[in-house]
């Protein structure tokens, strides 16, 4: 699967770019007002008690700000943060080494926490609940268990698949926060802020247009802005104008609803090849040359959310809204 302009996942070359745009405190964070309000209370209460914040589970689609929020939590609590990904923790010893290096109150951020192995996850149980871990030293008859006490800390776990977490792990988080897709007003505000960080001027109409096509995701909004800025600079315009924005988005193949060429390919398959469906995912996968799991996890969710596809017992079916949007397919 090639990197897409509207892909919600982080592209490998975008890490430093995203870091430069991330807000560092809650007051700078745009959107997710319910989460912000709750975190403000939880953090203030923890600081008044002089205790670490309860363990926090952040879940929701990619690109909505889970990593940013984890860093904001550490900044607001005025503590250090250690960041790891679930798949990188192969053995219990890997996690034990990280936990034993934490200072009192520190934040441990585990991204993709749903991908922890069961043996590593079990080490977390006592660490989260009672702040100790048991490590087995030696093998066979000489094996013995050593208890290591840990300083109180805050675990922040992030996942796009909250349903994949085991009950015992999920229940050990005191704070559960679901990140929702952003509305266009919040995305527009993010785009204007990013333009300022990039020292780029953008007109109001362009910011609105980019927000409409960003699939409710700040990461997509910032990526599109960065590419439109390329067109503006090559054109030697003093700012990003709506004409340049529309031209750039057309060339980037991102339509008015935020759909790209792969979305179009999939919808064309359902509408034209299979008369709007219903058609099974395996059949769609073969027809467009993609894996079923990629369609199910990456392409399909946004199309369902936007009302282009509906799930039926017999397969996927194009909606009336989809026919209206793609009415020029056969012309």
UniProtKB/Swiss-Prot annotation:
It is found in: Cytoplasm. One of its GO terms (molecular function) is ATP hydrolysis activity. The keyword Nucleotide-binding applies. The keyword DNA-binding applies. Keywords: ATP-binding, Cytoplasm, DNA damage, DNA recombination, DNA repair, DNA-binding, Hydrolase, Nucleotide-binding. Residues 1-182 are annotated as: Large ATPase domain (RuvB-L). It catalyses: ATP + H2O = ADP + phosphate + H(+). Residues 183-253 are annotated as: Small ATPAse domain (RuvB-S). DNA binds at residues 292, 311, 316. One of its GO terms (biological process) is DNA repair. Mg(2+) binds at residue 67. InterPro entries: AAA+_ATPase, AAA_lid_4, DNA_helicase_Holl-junc_RuvB, P-loop_NTPase, RuvB-like_N, RuvB_C, WH-like_DNA-bd_sf, WH_DNA-bd_sf. Belongs to the RuvB family. HAMAP family: DNA_HJ_migration_RuvB (MF_00016). Has 3 domains, the large (RuvB-L) and small ATPase (RuvB-S) domains and the C-terminal head (RuvB-H) domain. The head domain binds DNA, while the ATPase domains jointly bind ATP, ADP or are empty depending on the state of the subunit in the translocation cycle. During a single DNA translocation step the structure of each domain remains the same, but their relative positions change. Homohexamer. Forms an RuvA(8)-RuvB(12)-Holliday junction (HJ) complex. HJ DNA is sandwiched between 2 RuvA tetramers; dsDNA enters through RuvA and exits via RuvB. An RuvB hexamer assembles on each DNA strand where it exits the tetramer. Each RuvB hexamer is contacted by two RuvA subunits (via domain III) on 2 adjacent RuvB subunits; this complex drives branch migration. In the full resolvosome a probable DNA-RuvA(4)-RuvB(12)-RuvC(2) complex forms which resolves the HJ. This is Holliday junction branch migration complex subunit RuvB. The gene is ruvB.
